[in-house]
């Protein structure tokens, strides 16, 4: 997934997910999301800045926690 994201960044498509936007819309924080997922806050921060991407299973869990569809979390 990292190589895929790197190649997309190289071609100018850097924002792959909208996790940060949806967190703001739902009035939640990245810290809260990290706690709910049992993940390191630095990992969630990387997702929010699009410097790395969650796997599909995690993205599904994020959607569930934020009461939205996966399609709402991706560009």
What are the language-model segments listed below?
Residues 38-54:
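Recognition helix of helix-turn-helix/homeodomain-like DNA-binding domains
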Residues 33-34:
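Short alpha-helical "recognition helix" segments of helix-turn-helix
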Residues 30, 41, 56-59:
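Helix-turn-helix DNA-binding elements, focusing on the entry/boundary residues of the two helices
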Residues 57-72:
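DNA major-groove recognition helix of helix-turn-helix/homeodomain DNA-binding modules
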Residues 25, 51-54, 65:
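Helix-turn-helix/winged-helix DNA-binding modules
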Residues 2-29:
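A short, Lys/Arg-rich alpha-helix, primarily the initiator
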């Amino acid at each position: 997934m990292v190589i895929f994201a790197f190649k997309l960044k190289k071609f100018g498509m850097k924002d792959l997910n909208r996790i940060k936007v949806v967190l703001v819309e739902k009035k939640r924080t990245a810290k809260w999301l990290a706690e709910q997922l049992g993940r390191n806050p630095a990992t969630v921060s990387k997702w929010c800045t699009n410097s790395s991407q969650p796997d599909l299973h995690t993205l599904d869990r994020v959607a569930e926690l934020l009461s939205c569809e996966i399609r709402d979390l991706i560009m």
